[in-house]
Design a protein with these regions (language model features):
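Divalent metal-dependent hydrolysis catalytic cores, especially in the metallo-beta-lactamase
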Residues: 1-22, 46-52, 74-78
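Acidic active-site catalytic centers that drive phospho-/nucleotidyl reactions
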Residues: 2, 33, 109
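Catalytic pocket-lining loop regions of alpha/beta-barrel enzymes
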Residues: 27, 41-48, 53, 58-187
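Active-site-proximal gating segment of KS-fold condensing enzymes and close homologs
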Residues: 23-39
């Protein structure tokens, strides 16, 4: 087929991203990461797995990033919703700093956050729900940008997966509009 390499994202792990029990989620992701490590070790020059982390606490997140890096993973799939505060909080600065230090891109996938979650009920016809599945990635990007995360960590690499890209120019326009007109009262 002419495929030279593959980046492997979890499927079932997307559902577990929204599980409310962070201890359960952490155990599932640790087991998945061990399995994925073994699977990718058959052809490490061609198979690149994305480790999953639970982000139960920022300290756990740092440890999970370090463990994934030690296993040779080249990127991390993050849950859309952490357990402690939100991703713009400075309590996550050690996580972002660790990702930069280890050169690990952090990936946010559609359907893994509260906005556009896989189990959310769409408004109107079911097909309308398909239009909203990118919302979680939009929310993450707005949170990181307006929250100053990229100002504090300019070398942080973030990937939005299966969220298309057509929304980006309009979203940038909306962000500029919000900032220019509403930044003083919408902090």
């Amino acid at each position: 087929d002419g495929i030279a390499a593959e980046i492997i994202y979890p499927t079932v792990g997307m559902l577990i991203c929204n599980h409310p029990d962070f201890d359960y989620k952490k155990a599932c992701f640790e087991a998945y990461n061990r399995w994925l490590y073994e699977y990718c070790s058959e052809a490490p020059e061609r198979l690149f797995g994305m480790a999953q982390v639970s982000m139960r606490t920022p300290a756990d997140g740092v440890a999970e990033l370090k463990a994934a890096h030690a296993m040779g993973f080249k990127g991390i799939m993050m849950p859309g919703d952490p357990a402690v505060e939100d991703y713009d909080s400075k309590v996550y600065d050690p996580v972002w700093a660790t990702a930069v230090e280890l050169n690990l891109p952090l990936s946010f996938h559609i359907l893994t956050g509260r906005s556009g979650a896989i189990d959310s009920k769409p408004r109107g016809p079911r097909i309308n729900g398909f239009l909203s599945i990118i919302r979680g990635c939009q929310d993450i990007m707005g949170t990181l940008i307006f929250g100053g995360v990229f100002d504090r960590h300019p070398n942080l690499k973030i990937v939005c997966v299966e969220a298309d890209a057509g929304w980006v120019p309009h979203y940038m326009y909306r962000m500029d509009h919000a900032y220019n007109r509403h930044r003083y009262w919408m902090k």
